[in-house]
Structure formats: structure tokens, C-alpha cells
Curated annotation (Swiss-Prot):
Binding site for NAD(+): 76-89, 281-293
Phylogenetic classification of the source organism: Bacteria, Bacillati, Bacillota, Bacilli, Bacillales
Cofactor binding note from Swiss-Prot or TrEMBL: Binds 1 Mg(2+) or Mn(2+) ion per subunit.
Residues binding Mg(2+), per UniProt: 223, 247, 251
Protein name: 3-isopropylmalate dehydrogenase
Native species: Halalkalibacterium halodurans (strain ATCC BAA-125 / DSM 18197 / FERM 7344 / JCM 9153 / C-125)
Positions contributing to substrate binding: 96, 106, 134, 223
InterPro entries: IsoCit/isopropylmalate_DH_CS, IsoPropMal-DH-like_dom, Isopropylmalate_DH
Pathway this chain belongs to: Amino-acid biosynthesis; L-leucine biosynthesis; L-leucine from 3-methyl-2-oxobutanoate: step 3/4
Cellular localization per UniProt: Cytoplasm
Cofactor: Mg(2+); Mn(2+)
Length: 363
């Protein structure tokens, strides 16, 4: 199989973790007889510095012609004083909108060998395997008008939470489709006791549920969902929610695992390349030191192989390699115990590559 991958290293540790991920992808390609080609492009702060905009048109074009997109991280304090439309994060929002990446998938899995990294008790997190499906191109982050009006103490500010019924239906249906190949349980998260948009969301969820009689649908208010993710995360299979709620809940759920450095994500559309990225930030404080955790980016590559390329065995090979490396005791500083020796980005990447090369031939 031949595939072209757009690589957007971005800012901070982004170039380091994407380089590590490319090494792993190349090991998979060599191992299974595939050909992956890579084309790098600018996004975020580095794009602002070089061409004056966080999302150059050339980058959008490279992504549109790719089979999959790998992103490192964007942003950093260097660009925090810029106007909102010139911030690095605006480039990522524009990329999502430009490629119609409406479905964000955030898997949360607790590795047995990393159970101690979580601040929660082992009996609470043991066996956690949930998936948050977040709507990504609507809601408060994109709704108009978005403005300030008036001045002084009577100055008003307006943000708009806007969705169409169709936008709700496509993301909820995606959650049900994913639940069909998991444990057939969907928790729809809303604020239907207050928000009109949530009341319509709940209506649409009930309509979609009729198409999937094998799947159990549960409605949960967002404040309760936030509590339950910490209190009893094992109850969840697939959670689906709108943009703002999903942004908050997915970061909360990430701490069930103990480190943002372990969690991948996928942003998908109905027809076009998916975007795959770690959920951690650009971590400029450790950029260039060779200590960044590459495992979330590597795991994001496994999601690319699965969801964009249909290469499920290859994806599992990466996932198994990550598990094997953790069992061997490799740890970057973010997941190491106090006083425990930590591994470099290169050491962990090399170990994952070796584990892939040593895997049983299933091609």
C-alpha cells in the first residue's frame, strides 16, 4: 500500500515527537511492505514567524492532497500577545474547519504498567477503556456573532452557540457507529435542563438511537458526567458531546491515565484525510532537550493506520509495541515515578521501533 502523509510539526516539542512518529511509521512500512511518503508543512507559531499567518494556504493544500495528516503541537507564550486572529491556535481551528473535520476521537486507556501514574486509586481506573467523541466544527468556538458591544459597566459580550440539526446528527451517528464495534453503549452528554441547544441535541440522539437498536443510549448532564469520569470511569464506553463540553471533558478524562503525554486523538471527516495528533501541548519549556514523551504521537499514528488507511493489524502492532516498551520500564519524566530514572525521546522511540521489528510476522 502506498500512502502520502502530511506532517505538520508545529511548535515547541512538536518537531521532536513527529520525527519520532515518522521513525515508527517507517518501521511499520518496512515490516509490512508498505510505502509511506511524508510532506512537511507549516502550522501555528512557526508559520506566523515564517510567513505571517498561522495557516498558510499552501499547508491547507498539502493536507487536502494527503491520505492522512500528522500534527505535533501548536502554540506557546511567544505568541500569546498577538491578536486573536493571528494566534497559533487559530491555525488549528482553521485547519479543522477547512477540512471539515467534525468528529474528534479521544480514546482513554489505562496501561497496566502505568496505573501508578494516575492520582486515582487502582481499583477505580483498572480496566478503563473509553472513547470521547467530540463535535469539532460548531458550537461556541465557531458561532457568530462573537463580539463586544458598548462600553464601561454596560459593555456587553456575546458568544453564540450555534448548531444545525444535521451537524448534531452526523456526530451522534458517528458515536453510535463506533460503539457498534466496541461495547455498544453510548452516553450522550448535554445540559438539557438549561440550554435549548442541548434539548435539541437530546432529541436528535433519541432519533439516531432508533437506527441502532443493539446500542444502549444513556443521557447524562455535563456536570454529572464530569463527576462520574473521576468517580467511576469504567461505566463509560463511548461518550458523545458538543464542542465546548467535549473540550473540557476530554482533558479531564486524560488525567485518569496520569499523563497527557500518553493520549492520542483523531479528527475525522466523512470524505477526506483525517488529522492525528497528541492531545498534549507544545511544552516549550522542554523543547529541544530530547526528553519529550513521543508515545501519544506514536499512538496517534496507530489511529491513522486504523481509521484512515484501514490497516488494523499494523495499528495493533504499534499499540502492542507501546505496551511492551512500557512493560520493559521505559519512562519519560512525565510518567516516571519520583526518583525513577527517566528515558529520552530517542531511547523510547528506538525501543518502540525494535519492538515492531521483533513482532511476529502477520503480513
Amino acid at each position: 500500500m502506498e500512502k502520502q502523509i502530511a506532517v505538520l510539526p508545529g511548535d515547541g516539542i512538536g518537531p521532536e515527537v513527529t520525527d519520532a512518529a515518522i521513525e515508527v511509521l517507517q518501521a511499520v512500512a518496512d515490516r509490512f511492505g508498505h510505502t509511506f511518503s511524508y510532506k512537511k508543512a507549516l502550522l501555528g507559531g512557526c508559520a506566523i514567524d515564517e510567513v505571517g499567518t498561522p495557516l498558510p494556504e499552501e499547508t491547507l493544500d498539502v493536507c487536502r492532497h494527503a491520505d492522512g495528516i500528522l500534527l505535533g503541537a501548536v502554540g506557546g507564550p511567544k505568541w500569546d500577545t498577538l491578536p486573536g486572529h493571528l494566534r497559533p491556535e487559530k491555525g488549528l481551528l482553521g485547519l479543522r474547519k477547512g477540512l471539515n473535520l467534525f468528529a474528534n476521537l479521544r480514546p482513554v486507556t489505562v496501561y497496566d504498567s502505568l496505573a501508578d501514574a494516575s492520582t486515582l486509586k487502582n481499583d477505580v481506573i483498572d480496566g478503563v477503556d473509553l472513547l470521547i467523541v467530540r463535535e469539532l466544527t460548531g458550537g461556541l468556538y465557531f458561532g457568530e456573532p462573537r463580539e463586544r458591544r458598548g462600553e464601561g459597566e454596560t459593555e456587553e459580550v456575546v458568544d453564540t452557540l450555534l448548531y444545525t440539526r444535521g451537524e448534531m446528527r452526523r456526530i451522534i451517528r458517528k458515536a453510535f457507529e463506533l460503539a457498534m464495534v466496541r461495547n455498544k453503549h453510548v452516553t450522550s452528554v448535554d445540559k438539557a435542563n438549561v440550554l435549548e441547544s442541548s434539548r435539541m441535541w437530546r432529541e436528535v440522539a433519541n432519533e439516531v438511537a432508533q437506527e441502532f437498536p443493539e446500542v444502549t443510549l444513556e443521557h447524562m448532564l455535563v456536570d454529572n458526567a464530569a463527576m462520574q469520569l473521576i468517580r467511576r470511569p469504567k461505566q463509560f464506553d463511548v461518550l458523545v458531546t458538543e464542542n465546548l463540553f467535549g473540550d473540557i471533558l476530554s482533558d479531564e478524562a486524560s488525567m485518569v491515565t496520569g499523563s497527557l503525554g500518553m493520549l492520542p486523538s483523531a479528527s475525522l471527516t466523512s470524505d477526506g484525510p483525517g488529522l492525528y495528533e497528541p492531545i498534549h501541548g507544545s511544552a516549550p519549556d522542554i523543547a529541544g532537550k530530547g526528553v519529550a514523551n513521543p508515545l501519544a504521537t506514536i499512538a496517534s499514528c496507530a489511529m491513522m493506520l486504523k481509521y484512515s488507511f484501514g490497516l488494523h493489524e499494523e495499528a495493533k502492532t504499534i499499540e502492542d509495541a507501546i505496551e511492551a516498551v512500557l512493560k520493559q520500564g521505559y519512562r519519560t519524566a512525565d510518567i516516571a515515578k519520583p526518583g525513577e530514572e527517566s528515558s529520552s525521546t530517542k531511547a523510547i522511540t528506538d525501543a518502540v521501533v525494535e519492538a515492531i521489528q521483533a513482532s511476529v510476522d502477520i503480513s
